[in-house]
């Protein structure tokens, strides 16, 4: 029986391959290690349902460091790197929407997107992309 965690691995493999073109300064993975680099982090949120159909969710967070600049008074200012966030988010959405395999007993849809959010205690912003997972169990 396939689980959301198994599908999380498929999402990882897909994004690892498809996001090569955007040349992340960090990586595609499951946890953050270096907040000074761009990362795409995949988090499983579990599933619930019957023996025939389970619904689960995965969140793909796109992290991009803010742009550092100096103000005239010499103080440091951090601004959202919105163009880069959008570039990586667009490539991520295209990759996720490109995948479909009816033979494996599951599928996903992008259920919603949140706006860019400031990462608490870090000089970066992130975009979450929410996947709703449908797992069909054949008897």
Residue ranges with predicted function:
Residues 26-37:
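Short acidic low-complexity segments
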Residues 1-24, 44-139:
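Charged, amphipathic alpha-helical segments and their flanking helix caps
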Residues 35-45:
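A short, hydrophobic beta-strand-centered structural micro-motif
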């Amino acid at each position: 029986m396939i689980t959301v965690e198994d599908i999380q691995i498929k999402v990882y493999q897909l994004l690892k391959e498809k996001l090569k073109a955007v040349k992340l300064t960090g990586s595609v993975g499951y946890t953050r290690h270096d907040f000074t680099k761009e990362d795409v982090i995949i988090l499983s949120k579990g599933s619930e349902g019957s023996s025939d159909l389970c619904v689960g969710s995965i969140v793909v967070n796109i992290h991009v460091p803010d742009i550092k600049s100096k103000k005239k008074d010499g103080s440091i200012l951090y601004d959202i790197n919105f163009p880069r966030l959008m570039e990586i988010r667009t490539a991520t959405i295209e990759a996720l929407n490109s995948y479909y395999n009816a033979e494996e007993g599951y599928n996903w849809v992008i259920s919603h997107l949140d706006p860019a959010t400031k990462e608490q205690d870090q000089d970066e912003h992130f975009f979450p992309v929410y996947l709703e997972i449908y797992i069909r169990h054949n008897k």
